[in-house]
A protein has these predicted regions:
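Alpha-helical transmembrane segments of multi-pass membrane proteins predominantly involved
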Residues: 1-266
Length: 266
């Protein structure tokens, strides 16, 4: 449990995450934010579903503690962050708390909801970092939130795409991030873990603040020096595609659940 919690940056094994995210090149940060999380959660599910399911009572409360601590610390610590990569570090800690909440139920529906959550989380992070890769001044990627001031005036489509990604990260309906959290909370409630569900809902509201703050900077602050023209259309396409996926997910929200059922993961 300690090794896996460290892998996914869950509290109290999260200490390395903010400094590593902020100090690493943006390309490395994007890797840390996506790939290890997918792998770590997949291994988490594999171990908890099969070898350890018969001893649920011995590890469930440990995961509940890790989940609650991660959701609270991630949501609260991110509020005053001004560096984009440091903010996304605390955001990832909070999101891993939600994912672990699903695992802590020890049920098939909880494991499925966590798989769906991590897939949607990955799509949201792909969109977020695609935006960051596009934002360059003098050959340097954007680092601080205030550097995005008024960007909607110069890059309206990119700003709109990031708005969709941020609202999805915040869990605002009808975006994909809302359904990701909805499935987690439903599996938690079905398992009778009402306190965990309530804390998850409260931290969701708190975390919405720092996502909306970025939107406020983009749309309502005075514009700064424009960023360089977009030259990598592959990355631009990734941003647009991820935002379309997140915005249109409500049309067929059961797609991941059906795929997981068909391939007999459980």
């Amino acid at each position: 449990l300690v090794g896996l919690a460290f892998k996914v940056s869950a509290v109290p094994f999260h200490m390395w995450t903010p400094d590593v995210y902020e100090g690493s090149p943006t390309s490395v940060t994007s890797f840390f934010a996506i790939v290890p999380k997918i792998a770590g959660i997949a291994v988490f599910i594999r171990f908890m579903y099969s070898p350890f399911q018969n001893i649920l009572d011995q590890w469930q409360y440990i995961l509940v503690f890790i989940s609650i601590a991660s959701m609270i610390l991630g949501a609260v610590a991110a509020i005053n962050q001004k560096n984009i990569k440091r903010l996304i570090a605390y955001s990832s800690i909070s999101h891993m708390g939600y994912a672990i909440a699903g695992i802590s139920t020890g049920t098939e529906s909880g494991f499925k909801s966590t798989m769906i959550y991590i897939l949607i989380y990955s799509a949201m992070n792909i969109g977020f970092f695609a935006f960051v890769f596009l934002m360059k001044r003098s050959g340097k990627y954007v680092e601080e939130i205030n550097e995005l001031s008024g960007i909607s005036k110069n890059h309206p489509l990119a700003a709109l795409s990031l708005l969709i990604v941020l609202f999805s990260l915040a869990g605002i309906p009808p975006l994909a991030g809302f359904f990701a959290k909805f499935y987690i909370f439903m599996s938690v409630i079905e398992s009778g873990m009402y306190t965990l569900a309530i804390i998850g809902l409260i931290t969701t509201v708190v975390s919405a603040f720092y996502y909306i703050r970025i939107v406020k900077v983009m749309y309502f602050d005075n514009p700064k020096k424009p960023f360089e023209s977009f030259k990598d259309y592959g990355i631009y396409g990734s941003l647009i595609f991820s935002s379309i996926f997140l915005a249109s997910f409500f049309i067929y929200p059961s797609i991941f659940n059906e795929i997981i059922s068909k391939i007999n993961v459980f």
